[in-house]
Design a protein with these regions (language model features):
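Bacterial Sec-dependent N-terminal signal peptides
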Residues: 1-21
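Accessory carbohydrate-recognition regions in carbohydrate-active enzymes
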Residues: 20-376
């Protein structure tokens, strides 16, 4: 049945790609360009960043193991999670990351045990929307991002044992399940060095379906008698019975400032569904990429140009947040304090001063003004 479902999904995806018409520059972009890389040989050293231009949080289907700088490689055939990432390059690696993963059948947390086979034929990757079929779990995962939040939608099979894993990774983390609110909160301190001692990325997930199974995870041990865990490597599982084709929606946000700010950042999603969020993201991308119009009879040239332009406007990363009063605030990577004003990060000055910042100054001057005033190297 799973193979039949994958075949049907592939046919529909192929039909959609064939029928697709170019209506904006974002349609030329492939986030998968440059992902067929490995440590020994780079063909780009990129990952498919599902994000908005200069967004605070990116999302990536995670094929690499926890801590692997090559988070997604095109030649991989298994996804082990959908990771919120802030990684500027595999060499700098990541910080503040955590992962979400749907599973069915057995309640598992281990990243190898929960991993699922996938095919690029059943994968749709755009800057503003991602979709993939996880064959081992018979689950379709969809993601649509905003600057600091994202909407997930999981389409489950008929199963008495459908779960969602939240993995806050190692180096010190905390996760708490709140069944009365269909909510999971927590923080991750995962980083690759160079952060203040009080560094945390606080996250919140809100589901639209009540939990019938809950468990906290500490050091790989799943404990159904606990709702929270503080550990070097903490996580959680929640579960429910699902009907065939039942969709479970999850709204996710995070903050480097506080748990309360993470809740505020969740409001970026408003009451929009995933299609509406994706449509708004598409418009943002078309507006940004549309600053440059290229005319060429060779569609491969257009795909190459706009895929590279997409990469050029991902960074510097916005590292600021909007508080309850509407004021711009940021967590300082210099001293660990919460301060007023903008902050941008994740740019390598040794390279970007040559081309990127002059380019931003020409094409996106208002953005570049703030960047030049408030930019930090990667934490």
């Amino acid at each position: 049945m799973k193979k039949l479902a994958l075949f049907a999904f592939t046919l529909l995806s192929a039909w959609a790609m064939t029928a697709k018409t170019i209506t904006g520059p974002v349609d030329y972009v492939s986030p998968l360009v440059g992902t067929q890389s490995k440590h020994a040989l780079s063909t780009g050293n990129t990952y498919p960043a599902i994000a908005l231009p200069w967004g605070m949080n990116f999302w990536v289907p995670q094929t690499g193991k926890m801590g692997d700088g090559w988070a997604y490689t095109y030649d991989a055939d298994k996804i082990r999670g959908f990771k919120q990432t802030h990684q500027p390059s595999p060499w700098i690696n990541d910080y503040g990351q955590f992962a979400i993963m749907p599973v069915t059948g057995k309640a598992v947390f281990n990243q190898d045990e929960r991993a699922s086979w996938f095919s690029h034929k059943a994968e749709t990757a755009t800057p503003y929307y991602y979709k993939v079929y996880l064959a081992d779990h018979d689950v379709v995962t969809e993601i649509a991002p905003t600057e600091r939040a994202a909407a997930f939608r999981f389409t489950f099979p008929e199963n008495d044992h459908s779960y969602v894993v939240v993995d806050a990774f190692d180096k010190g983390s905390f996760v708490k399940v709140i069944p009365s609110e269909n909510k999971i909160i927590g923080y991750t301190t995962k980083n690759s060095g160079g952060v203040p001692a009080n560094f945390k990325n606080y996250f919140v997930l809100v589901f639209d379906k009540p939990f019938t199974y809950t468990a906290a995870v500490a050091s790989g041990v799943i404990d159904t008698n606990k709702l929270e865990a503080t550990d070097n490597h903490a996580g959680a599982l929640i579960g429910f019975k699902t009907r065939k084709g039942e969709q479970v929606n999850v709204r996710v946000a995070s903050s480097f400032i506080s748990p309360e700010q993470a809740e505020l950042n969740l409001k970026e999603l408003g009451t929009d569904n995933i299609e509406q969020i994706a449509a708004k993201g598409r418009k943002v991308w078309n507006d940004v990429l549309g600053r440059i119009e290229v005319k060429d009879d060779d569609i491969d040239h257009l795909r190459t140009f706009y895929s590279c332009l997409y990469r050029s406007v991902l960074f510097p990363r916005s590292f600021y947040e909007i508080d309850a009063k509407g004021d711009v605030m940021h967590y300082s990577p210099y001293n660990g304090e919460v301060l007023p004003g903008y902050m941008f990060t994740d740019t390598g000055f040794w390279d970007t001063f040559r081309c990127l910042f002059p380019f931003l100054n020409l094409m996106y001057p208002s953005m570049n003004t703030n960047c030049l005033l408030y930019t930090s190297p990667s934490p």
